[in-house]
Amino acid sequence: MAASSGSPQLATEDHLRKGEAVSGLHAVVAGSVSGLVARSVTAPMDTVKIRRQLQLASEHKYHGILHTFRTVAREEGVRALWKGNVPASAMYVLYGSLQFGTYAWLNTAAASAGLPPQAHSLAVGALAGLVSSLLTYPLDLLRTRLVANRSAHFFSLRRQARVIWDTEGPAGFFRGGAWAIAATTLTTGLIFGIYETCTIAADTYGLPWLAAAASPTAGLVSKAAVFPLDTVRRRLQIVDAKHIPFFTRDPGAYSALRGTRFLGLAVHMVRAEGIASLYKGLTMALCKSTPTTVITLWVYQRCLRLLEPTRAPQLPA
């Protein structure tokens, strides 16, 4: 890949760099594959994170990461660590294809806007996150409902969707959607912005270690920055559920909050459980975020190298 005139020769091939011309179809295919691979590897970690996020202060079922893993596997079977994997896998495939497809299109379309490369990546990444999260949110809600189920009985995706439709209506599939989309937009923007900042600095100053650290750094910082929003929206996704007794030992506590909006639920959590409740599951989330981001970006770049062995020249910054 050629560097633009007057800029340092790039040490690494980066399909996410400002102005990089990537086929929309190839971006969609690579994004789908990267999303599916990342989901398959990290699904059990996601289950543990969500269980921790949904546990009320009055409950003492799960104590720490390893205890949660063991408890879920012992009481519900090892397969339970992959509960919700069907909608989650579909979501990751669709999300990955939309995210990287939108990013590839905007990356060239907005290259002439005159933004610095780092700001360009952040803005394009945020818009890509907005589009992908908006169109995949119902799958995210279904995944949360299926993962939250603590019983050994597995609910089918079709049954859960039917229950939501019958008891909550079409709007039930978008419960907490606005804040979730805002959080995902911010997360995606931070991931791409931080990733490109690190890789540009690595190429400019000849720091291979910084290039290697780009993906995990982007994942950790982005996840930590928006985690409280993620925790509140997980609670919001189940608060109106018909099967709430399957999700908690204290269904009355959730039932009392039916109809509560995002900010009201956040305030209630802080008052009833302390500000630390907003960060329940953060350790697991950070442990999951690093491999998820690394796998997603690495597989995406790798797929494009296979799909596009000859690269188009980089547009001027």
From Swiss-Prot:
The entry's localization annotation reads: Mitochondrion inner membrane
Instruction: Tell me what topology the record assigns in the membrane.
Output: Multi-pass membrane protein
According to the record, the segments passing through the membrane are 21-41, 86-106, 122-142, 176-196, 207-227, 281-300
GO BP annotation list: mitochondrial thiamine pyrophosphate transmembrane transport; thiamine pyrophosphate transmembrane transport
Q: Repeats (Solcar): which ranges?
A: 22-109, 116-201, 206-306
Query: What is this protein's record name?
Result: Mitochondrial thiamine pyrophosphate carrier 1
A GO cellular-component term linked to this record: mitochondrial inner membrane
Q: Name one GO molecular function term.
A: thiamine pyrophosphate transmembrane transporter activity
